[in-house]
Amino acid sequence: RNDALNAYKLPVEHLNGEGDGGMLQTFSSKALDGTGILGKKVEYVTGDTQTNADAARASARSMIEKDGAIMITGGSSSGVAVAVQSLCQDAGIIFMAGLTHSNDTTGKDKKANGFRHFFNSYMTGAALAPILADRYGADRKAYHLTADYNWGYTTEEAVRNSTEALGWETVAAVKTPLSQTDFSSYVAPVLNSGADVLILNHYGGNMVNSLTSAVEFGLRAAQANGKNFEIVVPLYSRLMAKGAGKNVAGIFGTTGWHWSLENTAGSRYTGTNAFVKSFGEKYGYPPSQAAHTCYCQALLYADAVQRGGSFNPCSVVEALEGFEFDGMGNGPTLYRAEDHQCIKDVLVVRGKENPANDFDLLELVDITPAEAVTFDPAIFGGNLGSCNPGA
């Protein structure tokens, strides 16, 4: 993801005292001062995961063994994140997850050396369900199409549980192959299924193709059970919204952050504008939520090293567990000790009817406060185990 890669170049500059400092200006922790980390200049190496767990593992292993990487970060799939996190645990390296939204990353597959700033499937369901019930009513029948992998399953489960708790009924849930590009055979049965809502537990190209197919089949214009037929996309990204074009207009989903957040929702989300300014001046366009979470993770790692006074992974773990911070664009945030999951507000968004440009595709509908998306860390199983300090 070029956007995420771009976002990693920025904190390296800011940590080394170059550029305008970005969110170092607004971050509640003042340990970092632009002289690197513990006086050492920050350098980085990159590798392509190919959205493939084996390729990602090989790339991360090479960075650790050949390049001497002491922290690995990134990835844009939960399968990749879980694989690389496990490798880092075994190697005694800290893993700061990038764009991964499956419950498993900080649930059944959590590791002491791994940390996630991005939100998860459970939080999406908890944030989205009340809005869906409010806008579409409690008497709805949902049909799920679910990408056949880790993230798809936890997202379907989360959205099903949270909507059923508010009165919705799930009439069908059908798995779709990750490699699927033509979804017409999956969309065709929906209208005669008794459902009046289609929920697309799809990400990236899957979502672009399935949503386009659903709209071409006339689902958005259809009636079912005496109601307007609706489509929901639980997790939005800018690239997906752009790829699906006008088909996203009016469709609800969630995101972890948006570049307009501070301007639309106020100073609680300070740090947003500082980051948008830094990123925009360097790259000529506003950052995505993927860029944001990656930038935050790099600074949070650096700050934890600085506060703990050591690059030892166990010192970093100690500094991050239970760390409360602010000024990084999400409002007050907790890095929870029990599962290494950041607990913060979640945005409910929908596609704009008349976007001004490719970066203005989503509008903020509501913000679900952190308290309302908080869950018992034990519910997803797993065990952090002990930190591995490495060599």
List the model feature ranges, each with a label.
Residues 306-318:
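Short, charged, surface-exposed loops that flank catalytic or proteolytic processing sites
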Residues 46, 50-70, 130-135, 182-194, ...:
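Short, well-structured alpha-helical segments in soluble
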Residues 1-17, 48-53, 76-77, 145-153, ...:
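Extracytoplasmic "Venus flytrap"
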Residues 31, 36, 45-53, 146, ...:
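Short beta->alpha junction loops
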Residues 111, 214-295, 309-311, 362-390:
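Extracellular/periplasmic periplasmic-binding protein-like sensory domains
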Residues 249, 324-391:
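Solvent-exposed, acidic/polar segments of extracytosolic/periplasmic ligand-binding ectodomains
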Residues 6-44, 165-167:
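Signal peptide-proximal N-terminal region
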Residues 6, 17, 66-174, 181, ...:
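Extracytoplasmic ligand/sensor domains, especially the bilobed periplasmic-binding protein
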